[in-house]
Each structure stands twice: as C-alpha cells, then as structure tokens.
Curated annotation (Swiss-Prot):
Its cofactor is Mn(2+). This is L-arabinose isomerase. One of its GO terms (molecular function) is L-arabinose isomerase activity. Belongs to the arabinose isomerase family. Catalyzes the conversion of L-arabinose to L-ribulose. GO terms for biological process: L-arabinose catabolic process to xylulose 5-phosphate. The lineage of its organism: Bacteria, Thermotogati, Thermotogota, Thermotogae, Thermotogales. It is an enzyme of class 5 (isomerase). It catalyses: beta-L-arabinopyranose = L-ribulose. It comes from Thermotoga neapolitana (strain ATCC 49049 / DSM 4359 / NBRC 107923 / NS-E). HAMAP family: Arabinose_Isome (MF_00519). Binds 1 Mn(2+) ion per subunit. Gene3D superfamilies: 3.40.50.10940.
Amino acid sequence: MIDLKQYEFWFLVGSQYLYGLETLKKVEQQASRIVEALNNDPIFPSKIVLKPVLKNSAEIREIFEKANAEPKCAGVIVWMHTFSPSKMWIRGLSINKKPLLHLHTQYNREIPWDTIDMDYMNLNQSAHGDREHGFIHARMRLPRKVVVGHWEDREVREKIAKWMRVACAIQDGRTGQIVRFGDNMREVASTEGDKVEAQIKLGWSINTWGVGELAERVKAVPENEVEELLKEYKERYIMPEDEYSLKAIREQAKMEIALREFLKEKNAIAFTTTFEDLHDLPQLPGLAVQRLMEEGYGFGAEGDWKAAGLVRALKVMGAGLPGGTSFMEDYTYHLTPGNELVLGAHMLEVCPTIAKEKPRIEVHPLSIGGKADPARLVFDGQEGPAVNASIVDMGNRFRLVVNRVLSVPIERKMPKLPTARVLWKPLPDFKRATTAWILAGGSHHTAFSTAVDVEYLIDWAEALEIEYLVIDENLDLENFKKELRWNELYWGLLKR
C-alpha cells in the first residue's frame, strides 16, 4: 500500500549570471553528477530530480510555483554551488509549500593545493553562498532541515534519506483522509482534538461515517472472498481449526474485506473504531484492524484520530525498512526495583509488523463492547531500540511527545493474556521518563516503532512547525520542566 517511489524530490541549485556561461555550465555539470550519484544509491526512497540552475528571481519563483502544483513533488533540496544573492530567492521561498532541505556541500571534497586559482574559487563558493542562503531562511523564519558535509559521506546521505521519508509522510498526510467509525470514547480527554487545526497544520482531513454503513457492507461480503482470505490466514499465521474459532475468524475476514473496500473508496490512509459504537457489527474489529495496519493503514482505537494519523506517518517514514510500527498503549507496569518495565498492548489492535515470531490467531471473550468473542493475532513484540510517540492538542497548538525506549525480551510466558504485547524500558529510566511524559501531557495511546528513530520525528515536527519534546538518555528533569515553561511562552507568542 505504501509506495515511496511515487514521489520525487526537486534538486535546486543556486547561482547567478555574474560568473558567465562557462562557469554556469560547469555548475550544471557538477550538479548533474551529484544527483546521478545520489540516485544510484539505494538508501534514497525516491527519485531526486535535477532542475535547471537558478539564476534570477523570476526563475526561482517559477520553479517553486511548479513544485507546489506537482503532487509527485514531496520536497525541495536547495544548494548554492556559487554565490546566489538571496534577495532573488525571497519571492520563491515566500510561496513554497513543500518541505525544504538546505544541503550545505561542495562538489570537490579537498582543496587542490597545487592548482587552485580564482577560477576554482569562483566556481566553488558554497562556503559563503550557503551562508547567504541560510540567512534568508532565518530572516524569513522558514522551517527547513540543514544537512552539512560532503555529498559522498554516508552520514550526509543518511540524513537526507531520513528527511525524504519524512517529507513523503507529510505529502501522504496532505492527500489522504482519516476515517472515523463512530466518535471518541466517552469522557476521554487526551483523544480529543481540533480537527480543523489538524488539517491546517498537519494536512489530515478527518471525517466521520456511521458504523451502520460499514455493518451493511460486512453483511454483503461474498463468501468466495471470505474463503480466499481464510486461505491466506492459514499460510501466514498459526490458525486454530475448531468450529468456535473459525466462526469468529470468518466474521473478522468479512470485516477486513468491507473495511478495505470502504477505506479505498474514501482514499483513506488511516481509520479509527470505538467499542462504544459497534451498531450491527458482529465483533469489535480486531484481526481485521491488525491486518489493515500490516498493509500500512494508520489506526487509533476509541476514536483516537491523532494516534491513527501518527501511526500512518511513521509507517510511511519506515516503509521498506527493517522493523515495524503499531498503534500502542502503555498498559501495565513491572516495578521490580532497578528493572522497571512497561508492558505495552491493547485489547486487540497491535500491528504484526512488530512481531518477533509467527503470530497466532486466537479467539477469546472481550468484556467490553457487548458483542461476540473477537478473533485477534497474538504475539510477542520485537526486541531492540524503538520509539514511542504521542501527539496531543494543547489548546493553542499540537504537541509531539517522543520517548526513546529499549524493547526487551519477554522472558516469562503469559498463557492467559489474549493479546499481542511488547515489553520495553523507557530511557533514561522508568521513573524519570514517565515523570517527563506525564508532565508533558503525553497520551496513553502512542505510535510505537522499531523502524524509525527520534530524528525522523524531530524532522516531521520541525517541517510542520509543531512543538516537540524528546525524552531520552540525555533527559534532565529540571531542564525539561524549564523547557515546558519556555515552550508555553514561545508558542503563545508565535503567530503564523
């Protein structure tokens, strides 16, 4: 479902007519070699497209107009090969709507000590050309990613590739829809939010459909489609054979087919359900939701559209990378002194992309929702570095809270726990990380990912100009409290 190859990134090189046609030709040739080399590196998720060298204000404005109008263009990379006076860039930058990366590099890695002359100096001016360009970005208060270093360096390429994945997630969020089946869980605060502001700031279009419409589609699913899907279940998962379980699994298969059809029809990228509004659905969607998350859809339980959108964004960022991303909830604690851990799970809806083993389909009673026993995938989660991220509405802004965690082995079996689960240690440690999370107002619902790291989320927040707070091994609680106070002032004063 997620194809980052559909996007492209425009590579804009700045110069001016001052240096003459011969120098401009060399600028174009060297830029072409850089872009060709980058496109030959599989680390980049999308194609980088070189545009003609930009030499005056009219050309610059025109290229940004075209970038804005091109849905395939997910972002713009700028580099000043020579000195390119930045007043020329104001009209173009002022209309830019795409994520922006400022690459501060140079074609040659080393100074040619024995042959360097003024022709070389006039050609290779990014050392001061990019400083001029950096000033106009700062003066215009533009959100941008700055990457510094030689274009052949692995670290430089990794940072560009991460940013490209983030930009793809932003473009995806601006063109798709989040479908809500029913409303938020009654009386819950953190899952609420301003859907109008979400579309303005994040690009997410969030709309609600009645569960009854979905229920009618479930009833109309052809039996032959159900049989085909059951064959796939048997191939991919450990599946029970008893009649009680198979009946429940068939109902989830029907819901999966109906949900997928509905989501495709609405051009949806994510969706929510709530156990308080199931209408004529036979079960709370469990296996069906897990399967759709596995395809790449974002999901949020209990109407949590912010979690659904964030899960989708991380899935786009991590598409094709090792690991996975899931809707998650901090469920219960293991509080042995010195080894405090969090058990993350949800009633049914944990994505199998984070499974460390072949998932099992199980059917068990569910005490809420008032429906038949639902089928779900059960598994232990992957081990290793991960992130937990939550987006909350603070009234005058969105706040992204991110915690680096270490997922650890589940050393004891839990034979009576009928849900997928993952066990992690928050960094820097349980007490400080949890204190900071609670002080920041982070939700109990999160996007949990073993595919992306904190840098992706920082790039995402900065590109969208929303507040972010990072809780990691460098946390100082007193400074964190100060950051919360400073942010209140900053975001209160900021008017854009």
